[in-house]
């Protein structure tokens, strides 16, 4: 609180003669609100700079990577926006007007956090940033290798606990979350204390995508988030005694485009061997493609839309100008809906996606319908019996 603010407070503390008591109380309340929000609040109304305190029964967790597409999101559903692009005060104000939290991205080198003093400094820096930007918490996104016997194993759990304690203490109603792989079984050599981290934060965002990051079988193109494999990951988290209410299902709004070394008549696409963290093949042989691009390309494909009944995922084949065959795997409302049923059956905390910018918000009639269908599928369904 700056000195001019203090002087201003003292001036109104002595009631001038003739001012009705209720009017004075209202004035004091307004000034207190402005002081609490800060004089540099960028929002049209100062109360929009106050942190969100409400905790929804069902979480819809949105990752936003920048620009202004957020203006076209389905705000009737959104509960949290994790900002992984440049900070946008307009987004913060608008999200708060809709009762949605806006949280920071948290990333740090695991080698550094072994030092408790470094952890304290990092947390203080992030907390100060959240306060000055009127944000509601932090999403910790650390996808680095950790050896089970290394000092980083315990340091990471300590970082999450200390971050949660600090944010909860300093920002009322704040939220601290942690991103985990689709399975707790040391995916990409990430040996984390998943139960300890889940206990230490508000909830885990399970990244149920990039599930071909380590291909141990045939080097062929496959679904980004195969149905059975995805749900097995959640079963494994729950078997570790992690409360389902600590799990948010993350779904992909993008796919993978693979160049086929060979494309068989029964649509098996052999891909180049690109090793990753010990595995002989990986989805690094392909490139990520947003849903909006996929929807534009599918009509000009050589196969049309195809469906894999085992992986319960859509895909298609196309031929590029150089004559090479490609296979594209992705998720659509049908595949997402099948997986989302698990959320209600096992009472997970909610759903989210990477990332909301992947849809077409141009206003084109066909694109608009496709975009609405992707948002619609996030809504909780009736419990399956």
Curated annotation (Swiss-Prot):
This protein's GO CC annotations: extracellular space; lysosome
A Gene Ontology biological process term: oligosaccharide catabolic process
Sample GO molecular function, one term: chitinase activity
Glycosylation: residue positions: 193, 228, 262, 299
EC number: 3.2.1.-
Primary residence: other
Alphabetical keyword list: Glycoprotein, Glycosidase, Hydrolase, Lysosome, Signal
Catalytic residues, chain numbering: 143
Purpose: Involved in the degradation of asparagine-linked glycoproteins. Hydrolyze of N-acetyl-beta-D-glucosamine (1-4)N-acetylglucosamine chitobiose core from the reducing end of the bond, it requires prior cleavage by glycosylasparaginase.
Listed name of the protein: Di-N-acetylchitobiase
Protein source organism: Homo sapiens (Human)
